Amino acid sequence: MSLPLHPSLNNGITKGSANFSGGKLRCKCSSSPVEVTLAGNVAHNHACGCSKCWKPEGAIFSVIGVIPKEQVSVTANADKLYIVDESAAIQRHACSGCGVHLYGRIEKEHPFKGLDFVHTELSSEKGWQEPQFAAFVSSIIEQGFDPSKMDAVRAQFKSIGLETYDALNPPLMDAIASWTAQKAKI
């Protein structure tokens, strides 16, 4: 039985284009949608099981990538955006009309400061980097997912070619650890 991981993953992965130059994200509002323009492709696109990321209705995971904040601009209806949790490291900017998260920005000192987190599924353009891995997989249990089905979740990710982690993937965890060591002058 197939689990509803995410609409963009449920039928396998669509490969992105190495030459993709970006596009527009739009919230789900039928009139006056918030529009965010991305002037490039994302990196480190991944399925995320954390409790903070926005997920489409019925999905167990979100799919989220990062892009330099200089390549992100709100191009329509910015007045509808609000920050979901101002105390969070990632300031998730969501639409007050439909609740969709358009981008997350880190304003405080952090290893990923300068990168914005975005959901490319909100774009009608094709060519975005495909998901590379699944992160924070066990976190879905904290949101009510049945722990006895975790092997099935991991098997389904494996069947579409994605490794699963209960944090980020090793290169990103290495980047965080390197940043932390540098700050501590180790």
From Swiss-Prot:
UniProt KW keywords: Lyase, Metal-binding, Zinc
GO terms of biological process kind: formaldehyde catabolic process
Signal sequence region: none
Positions of Zn(2+) 1 binding: C27, C29, C95, C98
SUPFAM superfamilies named in the record: Mss4-like
Catalytic activity: S-(hydroxymethyl)glutathione = glutathione + formaldehyde
Residue ranges occupied by any CENP-V/GFA domain in the UniProt entry: 20-166
Name this polypeptide is given: Putative glutathione-dependent formaldehyde-activating enzyme
Organism name: Fusarium vanettenii (strain ATCC MYA-4622 / CBS 123669 / FGSC 9596 / NRRL 45880 / 77-13-4)
